Regions:
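A conserved catalytic-core segment of Leloir-type glycosyltransferases
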Residues: 36-109
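Carbohydrate-associated surface elements
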Residues: 172, 194
Length: 200
């Protein structure tokens, strides 16, 4: 199967980044074709057998080949302290435009049969608009983001409405999701995070 993964953060330094990277690695090991769309402010480590599509951001000073600000987060990240609430209207428009372009280009070239987006948030909303079955994993910080920045609630609502399924990584996340978006109850799957048996 051709599966496109979309995340709001790089593939290291955050829970959802690590989650996305591990999913990509293991799907590729099982013979699936995988593409990942994500933000980056430095050269990413390649994953064998995985197509990497990233939107470039500026970490310290604006770069010509990148958006002139750092990638936004819900809290902080080892490589960014910018939050979604820090973005002004122009920066948010640049963010959405850059990711919409990257997602549409990946869809056109990679031709995914399924999209798995992380967080009930902006990029899940962008991903779910193209008529391709979309699954979203809620990690909890997205739901906290709706509380913290109500101006982003609309993106989350549309993402939740347009996706086929939502994966909750814990019972608490599932309850918070259903409280905020009651229409998702029938489409939610509880799937606890796994672990690497080779390590633990």
């Amino acid at each position: 199967m051709r599966i496109m993964l979309v995340n709001h953060f790089p593939l290291d330094g955050s829970g959802s980044g690590t989650y996305t990277k591990n999913i990509a690695v293991h799907l590729a090991m099982r013979g699936h074709q995988v593409c990942v769309v994500f933000p980056e402010n430095e050269a990413p480590q390649e994953i064998p057998g995985v197509s990497m599509r990233y939107v470039r951001f500026s970490r310290y000073v604006p770069r010509k080949d990148a958006l002139p600000f750092n990638f936004p987060c819900f809290t902080t990240h080892p490589r960014s302290v910018t939050t979604f609430g820090d973005l002004d209207g122009g920066e948010l428009a640049q963010y959405l435009t850059a990711f919409d372009t990257a997602i549409m280009q990946a869809i056109d070239e990679f031709k995914p049969e399924l999209i798995h987006a992380q967080h009930v948030w902006c990029l899940a909303w962008l991903s779910a608009q193209h008529g391709i079955p979309t699954v979203i994993t809620t990690h909890g910080t997205d739901l906290m983001g709706c509380e913290k920045w109500p101006e982003f609630q609309g993106f989350a609502e549309l993402a939740a409405k347009r996706c086929e399924k939502i994966i909750a990584v814990s019972g608490d996340n599932m309850r918070a999701l259903h409280c905020r978006f009651p229409e998702t109850v029938e489409r939610t799957v509880l799937l606890h995070n796994g672990y690497n048996e080779d390590v633990f």
